Amino acid sequence: MPIRCDMMAIAAGAFLSLQPAWADSAAQPLPPVDAGSRMMAIGPENGDLAKRVGAWTVTETVWDAPGAPPKVTKGLIAERRMVGSMIQEILRDPADAKNTVLRMDYLSFNRVEGRWEYVSMDTRAAVGIMTAQSIGRGRAAQIEVVFQPFALPGAGQDVSGQMLRMREEIINVAADHDVKDQYFTLADGTGAEWLAHRYDYVLR
């Protein structure tokens, strides 16, 4: 019996001697996360974008001028995927055997600046790389970005270099339905804005 008591006392002493080490370990604060790492996290705004990935059927409508009749192209396919915190969209015509990229864009919320950033490239028009930003945070269900002014080559054989302003509204109509509207304003002295381009997306 005395031997058993001695063994219990030794075990209890060992337990108590280890307890402060456990307590000290539990009390150690987690290492601080630097600002860059925090801002690289996807965040709620880009988390909403991640819900829009997948394949979408697109109807494209173009109005060349205010009051012009619409030109409609149906059955295009947009493929969306996340690239880091950005959503990438690639537009193709499934009837094209070469699977040519018609248009590509990227959209992301810049958590440092607190605004949306957007870039697009259209292989069907001589407009180069177009960049746009929002004024502020806005709403995830309706994002508005304003493009840097750019020039159209103009009609006919001679390059006229018609300057153009453009803003774009990206509207989440429903979980399976998006609309992207582009409004043009020509630098022609009228200041008239019109809906020039619409992409209507339905999730496949």
Model-derived segments and spans:
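Residue-level recognition of beta-strand termini and adjacent short loop/turns
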Residues: V83, N172-D176
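N-terminal helix-cap/turn-to-beta initiation motif at the start of protein domains
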Residues: M40-T57
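Bacterial N-terminal signal peptides
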Residues: A9-Q19
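Bacterial N-terminal signal peptides that target proteins for export
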Residues: M1-I10
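Short beta-strand segments and strand-loop junctions that repeat across beta-rich extracellular domains
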Residues: K51-R52, T59-A65, F109-N110, K180-A192
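Edge beta-strand at a domain terminus
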Residues: A27-P31, H177, Y183-R204
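Boundary at the C-terminal end of the N-terminal hydrophobic targeting segment
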Residues: A21-A27
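Central antiparallel beta-sheet cores of small beta-barrel/beta-sandwich binding domains
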Residues: M39, V58-R165
